[in-house]
Amino acid sequence: MAQRQVRAEALDKVDPVWARIRGEAEEIMRREPELATLIYSTILHHDSLEAAVVHRVAERLDSPEVSAEMIRQAYADALEAEPSIGEAFRADIVATVDRDPATNRYLEPVLYFKGFHAIQAHRLAHWLWNKGRKDFAYYLQSRSSAAFQTDINPAVRIGRGIFLDHATGLVVGETAVIEDDVSMLQEVTLGGTGKEAGDRHPKIRRGVLIGAGAKILGNIEIGHCARIAAGSVVLKPVPHNTTVAGVPARVIGPNSCSEPSRTMDHLFEDNDG
């Protein structure tokens, strides 16, 4: 028991996110023995957070055409070439727990949240895309769309610290960019305005909050820490630290907080602007 405690303390110093997840998993094993197989196979069987996340996402993407094992091997190649993908896993977990009032455990995104799973599936698809393995990347996009009800083109560049709440109905087009620390809710579209090729999708800068059902169309910039109200249709660039709302969206005024993606504050005063 003492040796196990020493190992846990050492892990907490080296990888506190993974240490916390393992501790939460052990607590579930004690409290919910019916879930022992799930918890052991998904969390406690693995020696790193990367292995646990890869296992969970690969199992959810498993199909008769492309097995979970093949997907795990592709992840292994990606993580060996770009260890920063594992750092993004951690940043997304912390962002999710920090911003979602419905959860306070790091384990929950890994086990249960399809928004987290969809983003991590995209990270592999994007790596494959950049390596010229476009058919495998397209396959993962298609499979992820069926499994998680999200459709993210594998060419899309996505930063870290991303929170995708509920996830259902997210659509992100090929030339879109999503920078670090962005929060998005369900039914968001980052789309084009026609059938022209080239750079035609939105650029979402750091710290932006995009409300449920918002549609942002065209090659326009949403400035850092801007806030897009739920249900808005955005057709023009949005300045940084600004709230827009409506169909079509109009400027309501400056944000009442400097980091809307972290506070998740969707409300604004009727007399703003």
Residue ranges of each PLM-predicted region?
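Terminal amphipathic alpha-helical/low-complexity segments used for targeting or macromolecular assembly
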Residues: 1-143, 259-273
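Structural signal for interior beta-strand "rungs" in well-ordered beta-sheet cores
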Residues: 145-252
